[in-house]
């Protein structure tokens, strides 16, 4: 089971260290603290290396966002048959990771900064968050949904609609409330489990039915 991971960024360990420093600078000092000079000092690397790896400052921001999004995992079990239990585990893992990332200081800082920039240039940071963050997560999750449908474990007409139903069940209004200063959940695992239960009640296929569908499809 390996839903499409082509959109997942592949950073070297050293690049990951640099991105962690960039995230720390953003959380501790805000937008103005995140400069290529400041990041080079904090990460003990040259500005030339930063430009080589990430390009300009927008490239650093895009890499930071993609790095954060990569922490929301789906499946990575090459060659393993997708079963109802494995699908459930992968959905729960996705839900837990999503909640943990959204509730983190980095995500909240990035989103608040993007909101604060909405009146300037259409919020360049907001566009980066959508393209390198949310869409990356969406594509990987929808690949898992499609894998579940091919295995006759999920039933839906539109993967995008099914995924956004699941996303809404996981996140609800929690992200907005956290952006407004409320604390995150004490138990992300339980929230993810409840969301998966509700999603499978809507789109899951009972085991007997799934077996019959696989037989009829010759799988």
Question: For each of these PLM feature ranges, what is it?
Answer:
Residues 1-5, 93, 97, 139, ...:
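C-terminal peripheral helix-coil segments that are non-catalytic and often amphipathic
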Residues 8-14:
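Short, Lys/Arg-enriched anionic-surface-contact patches
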Residues 14, 57, 64, 68, ...:
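Hydrophobic/aromatic residues within well-ordered alpha-helical segments
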Residues 17, 21, 25-59, 63-67:
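Helix-turn-helix
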Residues 31, 54, 115-121, 132-133:
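Short helix-capping/turn signature of helix-turn-helix
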Residues 65-94, 102, 144:
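Amphipathic alpha-helical linker/stalk segments
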Residues 66, 88-124, 171, 205-209:
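Helical hydrophobic small-molecule/effector-binding pocket
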Residues 104-109, 113, 123-150, 160-164:
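Amphipathic alpha-helical packing segments from all-alpha helical-bundle domains
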């Amino acid at each position: 089971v390996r839903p499409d991971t082509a959109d997942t960024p592949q950073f070297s360990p050293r690049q990951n260290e640099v991105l962690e420093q960039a995230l720390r600078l953003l959380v501790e000092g805000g937008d103005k603290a995140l400069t290529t000079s400041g990041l080079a000092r904090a990460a003990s690397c040259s500005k030339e290396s930063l430009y080589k790896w990430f390009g300009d400052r927008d490239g650093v921001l895009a890499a930071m966002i993609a790095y954060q999004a990569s922490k929301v995992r789906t499946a990575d079990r090459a060659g393993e048959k997708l079963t109802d239990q494995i699908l459930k585990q992968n959905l729960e893992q996705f839900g837990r990771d999503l909640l943990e990332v959204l509730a983190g200081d980095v995500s909240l800082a990035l989103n608040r900064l993007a909101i604060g920039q909405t009146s300037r240039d259409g919020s360049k940071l907001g566009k980066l968050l959508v393209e390198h963050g949310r869409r990356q997560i969406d594509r990987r999750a929808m690949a898992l949904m499609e894998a579940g449908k091919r295995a006759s474990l999920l039933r839906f007409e539109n993967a995008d609609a099914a995924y956004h139903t699941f996303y809404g069940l996981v996140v609800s209004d929690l992200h907005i409330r956290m952006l407004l200063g409320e604390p995150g959940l004490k138990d992300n695992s339980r929230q993810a489990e409840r969301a998966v239960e509700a999603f499978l009640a809507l789109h899951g296929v009972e085991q007997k039915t799934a077996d019959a569908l696989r037989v009829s499809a010759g799988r």
